[in-house]
């Protein structure tokens, strides 16, 4: 076997590993956001208000956010391939338990445990992918993994709605348990041993934003944006059902359009981060705020709402990659630790966004969650503009 052949084989194996990590992101994210597409049947089946059903997203995000810096630091000596395998095992079992849970409290407890696993993955996944490939391909590997977000939006959540409409929500989670198991097998087969790298103790993790002004600003930007975006997105199905009397088929198609736009936004973001990730964040935040406002002004027109969802998805896709790049630029020597803090901020904001938006939905109507989203994403935009010199 020639040296060139060995290098090709090694390169192919590396990118198979990146693909396995991307698939992992897909199953983690779809599991986290699955209730978004199933809120109506879930709340009806379990006899809880739709806002209470949104706690499935809230508690998942709370555990993913608050637990991750501790778990990442405590597992800093654990081989990352082994750690990812354990995380996927938790996801597989958790989806299985969710599918057979006899009551809502048990389901929430299960989601809480799954959230811990999800948060740790978000902290280590991108850095794992970047380590698998040559340094010159690290950015492309990161973009590939982040594309799993768009794939999840294009296929995962709409597919969950489709499966629920053909079977029921319990069967949908059972299928996702099987899918999680397949991804676990792929990770074991495709990813080589990856000893822990660039990890620090808990005390040093929490000291990072105290010492690092750039990282602290990026975390504030991310938290405000995610609060607004996911506060609105968590209740997009009830909003479309109320405003447009949308059928499950229309909602599935609309969310697929949103997800496809997210894939486009991720592609654009991959180009923007090499130019100016801060400006990319500004453009994306502006696009999300504008799309939410125009969504409210679109009235009952289904076509107009789909167009606004496409703008929303594209803008979100741009922001996603830009915020990861800004985090890396703020703390290049402690990226995994910084990403654990980013994950804490991100997922806690998902949880709080879903919680506050749920309160608005239950007390002032579903339309109010769109105003909530506009206010918070605009705040993220203003912070980014006001701190331009410190985030470049």
Describe the residue ranges of each PLM region.
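Paired small-residue
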Residues: 94-97, 105-114, 303-311
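Conserved MFS/SLC helix-loop-helix module at the cytosolic interface between two early adjacent transmembrane helices
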Residues: 66-105
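Helix-loop-helix hairpin linking two adjacent transmembrane segments in secondary transporters
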Residues: 104-106, 134-191, 239
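Intracellular juxtamembrane helix-capping segments at the cytosolic ends
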Residues: 121-133, 318-331
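Cytoplasmic helix-loop-helix junction between adjacent transmembrane helices
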Residues: 110-149
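Helix-breaking motifs and short loop linkers at transmembrane-helix boundaries and internal kinks
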Residues: 47, 79, 100-106, 245, ...
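C-terminal transmembrane helical hairpin of 12-TM major facilitator-type secondary transporters
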Residues: 279-323
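Helix-to-loop junctions at the C-terminal end of transmembrane segments
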Residues: 67-80, 265-277, 361-362
